[in-house]
Design a protein with these regions (language model features):
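Short beta->alpha linker loops
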Residues: 20, 41, 62, 131-132
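Short, well-structured N-terminal submotif of metal-dependent ribonuclease cores
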Residues: 1-38
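PIN-domain endoribonuclease scaffold, especially VapC-family toxins
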Residues: 30-84
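Hydrophobic/aromatic ligand-binding patch that stacks against planar heteroaromatic rings
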Residues: 28, 100, 119
């Protein structure tokens, strides 16, 4: 059985970090039908956001380290080898996710970002919420 290639956007990692109803993300990361991919840029964005004061008041250093350890233990690391220029995306800081999706030929980007979700897809990659993806893999 072929596995789904999935990229989990930083906003979902942060939601997992602060415990907002995404504890199931742990099981997705360890699923037999899903390979979650990570790149330096995504990890750096996670660290940058996790260190912001508005996030730090909800989490301990230990929790940040646990989430990073989950990423490193459960995800496949890859580098971005493509460049994407998109006039459809308002936040140019998210272009790396599209480039990463092209590089690994991702099946899905999981996100809560409304701008990314409005694209619905990028080349072969579907852009969906965690809940939508959960419904897809339960079928």
């Amino acid at each position: 059985m072929e596995k789904y290639k999935v990229i989990v956007d930083t906003n979902l990692w942060i939601s997992l970090l602060i415990g907002k109803k995404l504890s199931e993300l742990y099981s997705v990361c360890n699923s037999e039908i899903v390979d979650v991919y990570i790149c330096n840029e995504l990890k750096e964005e996670f660290m940058r956001v996790a260190s912001q004061e508005k996030i730090r008041k909800y989490v301990t250093n230990e929790r940040v380290i646990q989430t990073l350890e989950l990423m490193e233990a459960s995800c496949i690391f890859s580098s971005i080898k493509k460049t994407v220029v998109s006039s459809e995306l308002r936040d140019i800081n998210d272009l790396y996710l599209l480039a990463f999706a092209e590089t690994i030929k991702a099946d899905f980007i999981l996100t809560g970002d409304k701008d990314l979700l409005s694209l619905q897809s990028h080349n072969q990659t579907k852009i969906v919420t965690y809940r939508e993806f959960d419904e897809i893999i339960k079928k």
